């Protein structure tokens, strides 16, 4: 089965073709980061308009790269949610029209299920059951994965997501959007231990996250630092260590509670080199292995949507011609 995947949930427009026999045949992503950088974050209306402009060309390009025509496809998968309403509608409308015009089955995919399954696109994918850390600009959650489609949310952020905290902290430090890569670069220049920030909710039972208090602590540190550039680098280092420590502590706790021997990490923050380094260290000491998608599949992409869609189409899932989207769609509602 060959499935066309379409992703448009936020500020990346993406298309991909995945084949059940041959794997990922082609994928392409157009990032709008430069367009939104001047605003310090994503402007929903601009994102939607750019999806309209870029999506047809991206789809045509991945079909050419895969050596296929629309007649060679067996299905279409698109991101139904969660995400920005207008951005989701662009992808949904295109995908459903494309599928209807060619008589192809189509299925709407949960964006976070796509991230959860992204590490399975690698040459040596982890076997289920496992625990997944999904960590991005909009979500931070730990999920127990018994099998495909059998998910139990163990914990999630009660306020800001980790990626959102990176973006807000970067803004406080005068760094560009997106904040994650900018803070990681500045953190290299920081002095270890110079700034100690809280590890929220790690001193109590449970697997939920909270990053709003950490952001407040950063604000006070920035105000105290003034224009001292070394102090700002120290804050970036301290902030990154606090987020990484929090995520690592919760991951280890989730592994201990579930007895899983495998952890998958996905989402934009999953590309953070320090997070990967620490999880690998703790995994070796605690007896679990951590698995990650390649860096280009950590951020939003259509390869993960095409793969998740293929799995759902093979399992018999189909959507009708209604292309309603779900901007808010708890993963716990997915079956």
Curated annotation (Swiss-Prot):
Binds 1 Fe(2+) ion per subunit. Its cofactor is Fe(2+). Fe cation binds at residues 111, 115, 300. It comes from the Bacteria. Substrate binds at residues 134-138, 167, 180, 272. Pfam families: TsaD (PF00814). Its EC number is 2.3.1.234. InterPro entries: ATPase_NBD (IPR043129), Gcp-like_dom (IPR000905), KAE1/TsaD (IPR017861), TsaD (IPR022450). One of its GO terms (biological process) is tRNA threonylcarbamoyladenosine modification. GO terms for molecular function: iron ion binding; N(6)-L-threonylcarbamoyladenine synthase activity. It catalyses: L-threonylcarbamoyladenylate + adenosine(37) in tRNA = N(6)-L-threonylcarbamoyladenosine(37) in tRNA + AMP + H(+). It is found in: Cytoplasm. SUPFAM superfamilies: Actin-like ATPase domain. Keywords: Acyltransferase, Cytoplasm, Iron, Metal-binding, Transferase, tRNA processing. One of its GO terms (cellular component) is cytoplasm. Its main location: cytoplasm. Belongs to the KAE1 / TsaD family. NCBIfam families: gcp_kae1 (TIGR00329), T6A_TsaD_YgjD (TIGR03723). PANTHER family: TRNA N6-ADENOSINE THREONYLCARBAMOYLTRANSFERASE (PTHR11735), TRNA N6-ADENOSINE THREONYLCARBAMOYLTRANSFERASE, MITOCHONDRIAL (PTHR11735:SF6). HAMAP family: TsaD. Required for the formation of a threonylcarbamoyl group on adenosine at position 37 (t(6)A37) in tRNAs that read codons beginning with adenine. Is involved in the transfer of the threonylcarbamoyl moiety of threonylcarbamoyl-AMP (TC-AMP) to the N6 group of A37, together with TsaE and TsaB. TsaD likely plays a direct catalytic role in this reaction. This is tRNA N6-adenosine threonylcarbamoyltransferase. It comes from Halorhodospira halophila (strain DSM 244 / SL1).
